[in-house]
């Protein structure tokens, strides 16, 4: 009797959710598994879900997908004679007898409600809570998220398994390229990602004009104009580059040539850019909060993300100390090798196998 994996959210462009799902499916190949997906997945038997309800279609697609999940997915589950539904994001049918295991990547709207709409907060507080309550088990990416599940939603510890993510070893590795004088940030411009303090910290470098700050991530009409106005006010327009979305194939080169990745997020469910940068041998400066110390270990400079002076000090150290850069590069490569999709897959199989 097969497991049914629901990838009905899968967009055409790579995202963290999609990367998690696709890499995990490769490791679940020994299970009897069917996949619902709007896109073709190499080497995986897929049953097509409607293409107009993926994350490419924003809120409209999300609303369609939620209705489809409640009223159509249970029928497919029965038709395929599935014994377990695996949901790589926290979306599942509430009004059916489907047995399911769900992955929750973070609960950031509950941790920072001031930066999210009432709709997003209610979605987490009620829909995701209900999905979790009806699930057989909850997988999450880190002990930090496991703590949030218990603290915010009251999920019993015995119902949660934290399984670390991994990175794409075929795409992220050390390239023998000359380092260029830019600090790199990878991520969205949302306030909880902390780009505003990063820009302030960069402006505080004593030799700021010798360096650039590259912000690689999709523009957001709510936040990007504010950041650009801040850059102009600080007089560093020529040194801060807004790169918008970077094609996946181009990321390794950009990461490899950065003097450091600076990732001062206030909260992350995992923080995959930290691991990807380490695999490339690029020094990392990141937050001492949430899951980021779990991911970075002793192979990065950990800073208080609320303290801009501390971020500046770390960037200054990277810019001026060759031995520090060399040590962090070497330690990062070694540390990143502790993470693999094989390990993630094996731990996930152990959880799913309990409920087949």
Could you describe each region identified by the protein language model?
Residues 1-356:
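Carbohydrate transferase catalytic cores enriched for Leloir-type hexosyltransferases
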């Amino acid at each position: 009797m097969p497991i049914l994996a629901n990838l009905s959210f899968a967009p055409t462009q790579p995202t963290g959710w999609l990367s998690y799902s696709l890499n995990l499916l490769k490791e679940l190949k020994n299970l009897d598994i069917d996949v619902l997906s709007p896109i073709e997945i190499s080497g995986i038997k897929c049953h097509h879900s409607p293409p107009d309800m993926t994350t490419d279609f924003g809120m409209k697609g999300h609303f369609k997908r939620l209705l489809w999940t409640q009223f159509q997915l249970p029928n497919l589950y029965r038709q395929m004679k599935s014994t377990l539904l695996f949901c790589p994001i926290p979306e599942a049918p509430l009004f059916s007898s489907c047995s399911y295991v769900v992955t929750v990547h973070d609960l950031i709207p509950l941790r920072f409600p001031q930066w999210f709409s009432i709709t997003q907060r209610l979605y987490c507080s009620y829909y995701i809570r209900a999905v979790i309550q009806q699930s057989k088990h909850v997988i999450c990416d880190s002990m930090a998220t496991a703590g949030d599940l218990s603290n915010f939603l009251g999920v019993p510890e015995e119902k949660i398994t934290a399984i670390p993510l991994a990175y794409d070893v075929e795409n992220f590795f050390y390239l023998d390229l000359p380092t260029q004088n830019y600090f790199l940030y990878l991520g969205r411009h949302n306030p909880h990602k902390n780009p505003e303090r990063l820009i302030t910290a960069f402006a505080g470098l004593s030799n700021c004009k010798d360096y650039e700050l590259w912000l690689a991530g999709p523009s957001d009409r709510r936040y990007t104009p504010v950041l650009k106005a801040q850059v102009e006010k600080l007089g560093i327009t020529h040194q801060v580059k807004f790169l918008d979305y970077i094609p996946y194939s181009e990321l390794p080169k950009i990461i490899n040539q950065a003097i450091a990745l600076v990732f001062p997020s206030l909260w992350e469910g995992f923080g995959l850019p930290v691991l990807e940068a380490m695999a490339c041998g690029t020094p990392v400066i990141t937050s001492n909060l949430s899951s980021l110390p779990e991911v970075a270990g002793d192979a990065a400079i950990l800073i208080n993300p609320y303290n801009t002076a501390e971020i500046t000090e770390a960037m200054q150290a990277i810019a001026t100390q060759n031995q520090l850069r060399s040590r962090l590069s070497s330690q990062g490569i070694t540390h990143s090798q502790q993470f693999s999709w094989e390990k993630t897959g094996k731990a996930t199989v152990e959880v799913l196998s309990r409920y087949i």
